[in-house]
């Protein structure tokens, strides 16, 4: 149930333990997140993306957007290598829809960036590239027709799935379904990313959404 989701995510991910072991760190990082010249660039990028985060959603008041910004600024101070990357705004906003305390949301975001989407948000996106290769191999093994369909359309797997991963399926699934997936991510961790992605491709194949038999030359 939604009312238990925040506590469950914090406990299952280990974020609650990290928060309790380092009380006050969030406030320290938030204060530090505006001290360096490069922090101003990060803040400007966050400000631009805030207005693109779930546009029209009733929860995104000015006060709520400020909470998103605070969490992202604090994380940029914690992890300068990542600082801020598009996609993190959606993940943070979704976390804050369930988690009231900014420090708790900060630790959940830290878990996502550092243990679920490892090296996805860095400039090289090395972790993302590796995970996409793993997913392509899984699809070849479990859904071999999918690869053929995509090649016929001149599409790569990452063209479809990059935003699935970077936004943790927020842009791919209805909200209630997506948050059930998040329940599994915080419980079972990274393997859920691949299981859900393969299942989505399987559903598309079952419903002929990847059927290219009617596609011909323009």
What are these regions (language model features)?
Residues 1-218:
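Helix-rich, well-folded core regions that mediate interactions or catalysis
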């Amino acid at each position: 149930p939604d009312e238990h989701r925040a506590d469950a995510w914090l406990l299952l991910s280990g974020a609650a333990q990290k928060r309790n072991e380092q009380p006050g760190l969030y406030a320290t990082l938030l204060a530090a997140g505006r001290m360096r010249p490069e922090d101003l660039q990060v803040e400007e990028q966050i400000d631009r993306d805030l207005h693109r985060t779930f546009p029209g959603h009733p929860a995104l008041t000015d006060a709520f957007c400020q909470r998103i910004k605070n969490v992202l600024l604090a994380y940029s101070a914690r992890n300068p290598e990542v600082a801020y990357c598009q996609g993190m705004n959606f993940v943070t906003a979704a976390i804050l829809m369930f988690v009231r305390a900014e420090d708790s949301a900060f630790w959940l975001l830290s878990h996502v960036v550092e243990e679920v989407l490892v090296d996805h948000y860095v400039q090289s996106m090395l972790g993302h590239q590796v995970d996409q290769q793993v997913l392509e191999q899984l699809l070849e093994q479990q859904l071999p027709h999918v690869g053929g369909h995509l090649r016929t359309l001149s599409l790569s797997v990452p063209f479809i799935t990059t935003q699935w991963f970077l936004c943790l399926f927020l842009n791919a699934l209805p909200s209630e379904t997506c948050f059930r997936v998040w329940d599994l991510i915080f419980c079972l961790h990274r393997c859920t990313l691949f299981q859900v992605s393969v299942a989505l491709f399987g559903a598309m194949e079952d419903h002929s959404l990847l059927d290219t038999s009617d596609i011909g030359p323009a």
